[in-house]
Design a protein with these regions (language model features):
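Short loop/turn segments at strand-loop or loop-helix junctions that form parts
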Residues: 54-58, 90-98, 131-133
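Mid-core helix/loop region of P-loop NTP-binding domains shared across ATPases and GTPases
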Residues: 72-91, 113-130
Length: 160
């Protein structure tokens, strides 16, 4: 299956199937205001997936907001894993990460490395990231065992 076939992907099924993969993730990217957040929340609700809005979570926690200029990939990993534990779900959708990109100086290499290494210590969880499109994401080659890209353009996802 090639990237040209991504137009037929049902994201809920894709995320569930990713549980068996070496990298149990999907990165969905699209233009600003394309409806990614609404889609992610609805997908989570309809499928009993966890949903983490990182911007809201950081904004609502004084101990995190005070470190926003130093909020690095390790801090994000810690936040995601603690939220995944609390959510008690097999799939966690992670949204509104884009506010952190300026903190990371526009370099998503450390983010990509974190995604590759993101594992819950106690259970198999698939992580779905929703991000704004940027060149480093469009060029990222992260494939699953079936040679299907785990980096998916939002416009190629089948609607709910």
């Amino acid at each position: 299956m090639s990237n040209a076939d991504t137009a037929t992907i049902n994201l809920a099924d894709f995320l569930r199937a990713q549980r068996r993969e070496r990298y149990p993730i999907a990165v969905v990217h699209g233009l600003p205001f394309a409806g990614k957040s609404i889609f992610a929340r609805q997908l989570a609700q309809r499928n009993s997936f966890g949903y983490l809005d990182v911007l809201t979570e950081v904004s609502n926690r004084p101990e995190l907001i005070d470190t926003i200029d130093r909020f690095d990939v390790a801090a994000l990993r810690s936040l995601i894993l603690s939220y995944a534990t609390a959510a008690g779900t097999d799939v966690l959708l992670i949204d509104e990460l884009d506010f952190l990109v300026p903190v990371w100086a526009g370099d998503l290499v450390s983010f990509q490395e974190m995604v590759r290494r993101l594992r819950h210590p106690e259970k198999q969880i698939t992580f779905g990231f929703f991000l704004q499109t940027r060149p480093s994401l469009e060029q990222w080659r992260l494939m699953n065992a079936a040679h299907v890209s785990c980096v998916l353009p939002f416009e190629s996802i089948r609607s709910l």
